[in-house]
Amino acid sequence: MAPGEREREAGPAKSALRKVRTATLVINLARGWQQWANENSTKQAQEPAGWLPGATHDLPNAPKEAGPYQHAPKTLSPKPDRDGEGQHSEEATEVSHIKRKEVTRTVVSKAYERGGDVNYLSHRYENDGGVSEAIQPENDIDRILLSHDSPTRRRKCTNLVSELTKGWKVMEQEEPTWKSDSVDTEDSGYGGDMEERPEQDAAPVAPARIKRPLLSQANRYSETLNCKAHRKYSQVDNLKGRWQQWADEHVQSQKLNPFSDEFDYDLAMSTRLHKGDEGYGRPKEGSKTAERAKRAEEHIYREIMELCFVIRTMARHRRDGKIQVTFGELFDRYVRISDKVVGILMRARKHGLVHFEGEMLWQGRDDHVVITLLE
C-alpha cells in the first residue's frame, strides 16, 4: 500500500480519537465541578451563622439539624441517565481534581479605619472583662506622660511640669515674709506678737517642702514669679533668641561679602587682616571654606605618602643608604597611578621629603634628573 493511502486512512481515525478524548475531558471536568459544588454547599450549611463582637469564644462547628421544612441544596447539573447511575456513584467518592488555594487579602484599610476597629474591640473586651475605671484610678499627668500618645504632646507636658517645678523652686529660695493687710489686726497687736515670738517657742519644723502662700495674700507675687520663670525657661524665647542671633550674624557676613548687594567697602577695609596678623591668608575658622581646605590638605598628604612609597619600592639603594630614581623611570611607573606626578613631586620637595635639581621637570627633557628620597 502506498504511503499516501495510509495517511488518508489514518486521518479520520485520528480525528475521531481526538473527539473522544475531548468529550471525555469535558465530562470529567463537569463532574469535578459538580462534586465541588456539592461539597461547598455542605460546608456552608454546616458553618455557624456568624461571629459577634461580644462573643470571645468561637461557637462549636456542629452541623445544623435538618428541619421538616429544610430541603437539600439543588444541584446545577441535570439528572443522569439510568445507565450512568453506577458510574456517578463510583466517581463521586473520588478525589476532586480541582486545585484549591487560599487567597490572602491584598486590600488594606486605611490607618484611621484600623485604629477605630481596634479601639472599639479593645474597649468592648475591657468592659466585658469587668475592669472598671472606678476600681483602678490613675493620675491624668502620669497617664499622659507614660502612654503611647503623640511624642509632641508628651514633650509639651514634660516641659510644662519642669517649668512649674523650677518656678516653685525659685519661689522657695526667695521666701518672702507675708504680712496681713488688715488694719484691725495691726492695731490689736496680734501681728507683732506673732512676728516677735522667739524661735524656740515655735513648733517643730516639718520636713522641707514647697511653701505655697495663701492665694489672697500672694496672688500677685506668684503671678510675677510664674511670668519670670516662663520667660526664663520658655522654649519659644530661646528659639527666638537663636534665630535673632543667626540673623545678626548673617547680616554682618553679607556686609563683608564682596559678592553681596549689601557689601560695605569701608567696613570690610577696616576689619580685614593685614600681613603678619594671625589668620592672614587662611579661611575663617568654622566656615565651609576651612573645612574644604582641611580635606584638601589631608588628600595631598596621602598623595605625597603614596609617592614616597612608590619611590622606595622601585628605586635602587646606594651604599650610603640613599634611595634614588630618575624622573623618566618614575614617570613611566607613576603615570599609571596619577597624572599629577610633577605637582606631587614639587609639593614633596617643599615639605623636605625629596630632592631634585631644577625648578620644573619636563617629560623627555628631564628624564635623566635624579630624584633622591630624603626621609
Swiss-Prot record:
Acts as an activator of serum response factor (SRF)-dependent transcription possibly by inducing nuclear translocation of MKL1 or MKL2 and through a mechanism requiring Rho-actin signaling. Keywords: Actin-binding, Activator, Cytoplasm, Cytoskeleton, Phosphoprotein, Protein transport, Transcription, Transcription regulation, Translocation, Transport. Residues 294-375 are annotated as: Actin-binding 2. The keyword Aminoacyl-tRNA synthetase does not apply. Residues 1-20, 38-99, 173-204 are annotated as: Disordered. One of its GO terms (biological process) is positive regulation of Rho protein signal transduction. The actin-binding domain 1 (ABD1) is intrinsically disordered, and binds to F-actin with higher affinity than ABD2. GO terms for molecular function: actin binding. Residues 234-279, 346-375 are annotated as: Interaction with actin. One of its GO terms (cellular component) is plasma membrane. Residues 1-11, 79-99, 173-182 have a biased composition (Basic and acidic residues). This is Actin-binding Rho-activating protein. Residues 193-293 are annotated as: Actin-binding 1. Binds F-actin and ABLIM1, ABLIM2 and ABLIM3. Interaction with ABLIM2 and ABLIM3 enhances activity. Pfam families: Costars. It comes from the Eukaryota. Expressed specifically in heart and skeletal muscle. It is found in: Cytoplasm, Myofibril, Sarcomere; Cytoplasm, Cytoskeleton. The modification Phosphoserine is found at residues 150, 182. The keyword NAD does not apply.
